[in-house]
Amino acid sequence: MDIADIESRSSQELHEILVNLRKEFVNLVFQKKLAQCNNISRFSLIRKSIARILTTLNKRRREEKNA
């Protein structure tokens, strides 16, 4: 997900996406441990998406707090 797509979504949608990404990340970790994961590059994509979502959510919280 790119930053423009993330910022255009509501906070509720971002929370749902965040939960799904975290579940997918955990599943990839288990697959890697069992040597069944063939798409290692997906790890970094998921981690970066999670970081972008958390950054956007924290920015919104700070803006609401300061408003």
Curated annotation (Swiss-Prot):
Keyword annotations: Ribonucleoprotein, Ribosomal protein
The keyword Ribonucleoprotein belongs to this UniProt entry's keyword annotation: yes
Gene Ontology molecular function, alphabetical: structural constituent of ribosome
Any Pfam family: Ribosomal_L29
Tell me which CDD domains the record gives.
Ribosomal_L29_HIP
User: What Gene3D superfamilies does the database record attribute to this sequence?
Assistant: 1.10.287.310
* One GO CC annotation: ribonucleoprotein complex
One BP term from GO: translation
Of which family is this protein a member? Belongs to the universal ribosomal protein uL29 family.
Q: What is this protein called?
A: Large ribosomal subunit protein uL29
